[in-house]
């Protein structure tokens, strides 16, 4: 009957992701259907057409009578039945492989976040999100998938289709053959000259195999029904249990921590980068917005960063000891820091930009040097 090893290997992988009833169903499918069909049943029906004889010498009469008595061979009919009832299980296996692929991606992302955590980045929120996704997909351990959520629904749908196919093939078999074979078949069909009798080889043996395959189909159908009820109640139990699940009941809405003290955490969670360049002079009407305007933690962090930048800039210019025209205070624009009570805040008085000198860095000409009365460090004292 061909090589069943490919189908057997695929169905064998389903064992690890099935319930107890599903494992029993697969055992029945392997032992009492595939194995028996490939050995005893095939040999019993090996001469079904060659040993079919009719009491006439009319050419072609035996062929048309055999076609009328057996529109499709029992063996080929059972092969189709096995394929159809196995397809829903293979679709469920495809969903399992999809979940396992998701597990690999989540594990890879989790490793990257843990590496970032060792560098001082607070990624607890993102790690918690990955844990919730694993729980949603039914991933408990590496390589182990628990049946819940979408995977459970796929499993229930596969059981429903298997049950429908079992019932459909039983009805088709009953309509075409019945569940027993007669030793003599009467045929009246062209080109037979008259009504002829045709004889079937080993009708009793074939009837026994037909009844046996009927019982196996009924057992498989009963297992599907039991497994369907089990999966249904399991889904209801998981739904009730999910309301008190620690991932949903205790965590609450996920939100980033309000401590933006760490520069890396501030950058990782959407606050302004601690190394973001700030313009020393903002044109009138320009407002520098940093971070999330609705996030109080980022607001505090941005305020401290901007004040420090202005202070550093003032100190650097003062150290240069330059004199000259000063920068108009009108060019120093306040930064906006949204608050609950007011729209904007100016920098504190201690952090206002002091008037600074701007000096032309080009060397002075001789005329300017003579005209200048300002003492220089290299002048001789008299």
Curated annotation (Swiss-Prot):
Transmembrane parts of this sequence: 24-44, 77-97, 156-176, 208-228
Topology versus the membrane: Multi-pass membrane protein
Organism: Sus scrofa (Pig)
Stated name of the protein: Gap junction alpha-1 protein
Protein family according to the UniProt entry: Belongs to the connexin family. Alpha-type (group II) subfamily.
PANTHER family assigned: CONNEXIN, GAP JUNCTION ALPHA-1 PROTEIN
All ranges on the Cytoplasmic side of the membrane: 2-23, 98-155, 229-382
Native organism taxonomy: Eukaryota, Metazoa, Chordata, Craniata, Vertebrata
Basic and acidic residues bias (residue ranges): 342-351
Modification type S-nitrosocysteine: residues: 271
Record text on subunit structure and interactions: A connexon is composed of a hexamer of connexins. Interacts with SGSM3. Interacts with RIC1/CIP150. Interacts with CNST and CSNK1D. Interacts (via C-terminus) with TJP1. Interacts (via C-terminus) with SRC (via SH3 domain). Interacts (not ubiquitinated) with UBQLN4 (via UBA domain). Interacts with NOV. Interacts with TMEM65. Interacts with ANK3/ANKG and PKP2.
Ranges of biased composition (kind: Low complexity): 362-374
Function: Gap junction protein that acts as a regulator of bladder capacity. A gap junction consists of a cluster of closely packed pairs of transmembrane channels, the connexons, through which materials of low MW diffuse from one cell to a neighboring cell. May play a critical role in the physiology of hearing by participating in the recycling of potassium to the cochlear endolymph. Negative regulator of bladder functional capacity: acts by enhancing intercellular electrical and chemical transmission, thus sensitizing bladder muscles to cholinergic neural stimuli and causing them to contract.
Gene name for this UniProt entry: GJA1
């Amino acid at each position: 009957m061909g090589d069943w090893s490919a189908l057997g290997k695929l169905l064998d992988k389903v064992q690890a992701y099935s319930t107890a009833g599903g494992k029993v169903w697969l055992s029945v499918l392997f032992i009492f259907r595939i194995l028996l069909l490939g050995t005893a049943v095939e040999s019993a029906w090996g001469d079904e057409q060659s040993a079919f004889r009719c009491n006439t010498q009319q050419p072609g009469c035996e062929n048309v009578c055999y076609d009328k008595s057996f529109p499709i061979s029992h063996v080929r009919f059972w092969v189709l039945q096995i394929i159809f009832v196995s397809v829903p299980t293979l679709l469920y296996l495809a969903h399992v492989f999809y979940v396992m692929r998701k597990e690999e991606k989540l594990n890879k992302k989790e490793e990257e976040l843990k590496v970032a955590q060792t560098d001082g980045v607070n990624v607890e929120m993102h790690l918690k999100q990955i844990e919730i996704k694993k729980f949603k997909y039914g991933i408990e351990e590496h390589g182990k998938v628990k049946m819940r959520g979408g995977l459970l629904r796929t499993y229930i749908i596969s059981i429903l289709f298997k049950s429908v196919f079992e019932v459909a093939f039983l009805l088709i078999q009953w309509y075409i053959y019945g569940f027993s074979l007669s030793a003599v078949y009467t045929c009246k069909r062209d080109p037979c000259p008259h009504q002829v009798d045709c004889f079937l080889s080993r009708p009793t043996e074939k009837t026994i195999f037909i009844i046996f395959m009927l019982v196996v189909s009924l057992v498989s159908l009963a297992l599907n029904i039991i497994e369907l009820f089990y999966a249904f109640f399991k889904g209801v139990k998981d739904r009730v249990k999910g309301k008190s699940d620690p991932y949903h009941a205790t965590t609450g809405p996920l939100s980033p921590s309000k401590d933006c003290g760490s520069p890396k955490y501030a950058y990782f969670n959407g606050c302004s980068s601690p190394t973001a360049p700030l313009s020393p002079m903002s044109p009138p009407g320009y407002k520098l917005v940093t971070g999330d305007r609705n996030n109080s933690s980022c607001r505090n962090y941005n305020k401290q960063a901007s004040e420090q930048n202005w202070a550093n800039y003032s100190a650097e210019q003062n150290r240069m000891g330059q004199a000259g025209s000063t920068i108009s205070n009108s060019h120093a624009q306040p930064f906006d820091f949204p608050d609950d009570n007011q729209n904007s805040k100016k920098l504190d008085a201690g952090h206002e930009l002091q008037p600074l000198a701007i000096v032309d860095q080009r060397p002075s000409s001789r005329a300017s040097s003579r005209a200048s009365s300002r003492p220089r460090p290299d002048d001789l004292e008299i």
